[in-house]
Amino acid sequence: MTNTPRINRFLFVLYILLTVGVLVAALIWPAVRVVAYAPLRDLLFPAFYLPTSAGIEARITVAAPPTLEAWVREAAADFNRQNTLIEVGVISLRGAEAGRRLNASVTDLPDVWIAEAGFVRTSVGGVPYESGGPSVAQDGLAWVAVASSDVGGDLSWRSVADAARSDIRFRVAVPPVGSVEGMAACASAAAEYHQQANLTADLLNDAAFRGWLDELLAAAPNRSRHPRDQLGSRPPEVDAGLILGSDWQQLAKESFIYQPPAYNVVFDFPYLVRTNWYELSEDEANARRIAAERFSDFLLGGGPQGKLVNYGLERAGAEPSVQIVSFDDPAVRALQACWQ
């Protein structure tokens, strides 16, 4: 018979008790399960993971802008495979349509809305969603020009405007009328024109600026078609265009030059959870709220964040290389009338 030291027996029993305690806690509380990864437990007891204290299954719908939709769909598929009682579905929603589609009077509202940027949430106003939320990715505007165009290596709002003014044949592609990208474009143009990163409604409504911008926009042959598509035609339909940085990987890079505006607007994609589920019971509403928070945590994890680069996007909180434009609520309202 082996004469095991008493201290070893004590430590072994303590280890067993701690292991059992962590296992039981992980089966009961989601917060513990996050840090107590146990593949065997998940295999043997998958149904014991309860998204709420009531153990109610939750299916949530996440509305994402087209720029982010493919990434969110991939993340949702991975999340669904790892969770037994939570299922995440994804739909597409442009910020320009959010005010109409997310109105409190509309039935079957998505449980989460990922807006393009914080200013989009401000522009929509009274919808039943949080006023702010964690950023899950990042994007921004970028100028792209045909390598042989007149703008050469100097690519900016001013150089494009000067080229359009000096050559009647110079053509530019800009974001569609009434789009969120158009609002961001107006803010970027105004900031560069005034050399001012902190925009006000007065700066956006300045007559001299608006006249200068209208002259530039007169060189845009098609303001309803995506600028990426106009640049991607063979040959390109325009000499220069303003796109999102995530569109850059879809172009033949060797044929173009690329430069973010000196004053850029960040698309930070805030994750906004519904503030009420008036059509559901309290338990069902709580289950959806917790499921939405779980998916938010998942999107901010290393796996999904590491895949953003595959979609031409940057990680949440990436450090910008240029000045970032900021604007208050009156400036946001002025932006809505700017890009028409």
Spans of features found by a protein language model:
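Stable alpha-helical elements in mature extracytoplasmic
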Residues: 68-75, 94, 98, 113-123, ...
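Surface-exposed patches in mature extracellular/periplasmic domains of secreted proteins
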Residues: 86-93, 131-132, 200-204, 307-317
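N-terminal segment of the mature folded domain
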Residues: 7-28, 33-178
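Extracellular/periplasmic juxtamembrane helices and adjacent flexible linkers that interface
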Residues: 5-41, 53-56, 276-340
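Short beta-strand->loop
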Residues: 63-65, 146, 164-205, 213-217
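Short helix-loop capping/hinge motifs at secondary-structure junctions, enriched
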Residues: 148-155, 191-199, 277-292
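Ligand-binding pocket segment of bilobal, Venus flytrap-like solute-binding proteins
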Residues: 191-260
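Periplasmic-binding protein-like
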Residues: 133-142, 207-216, 252-284, 288-290
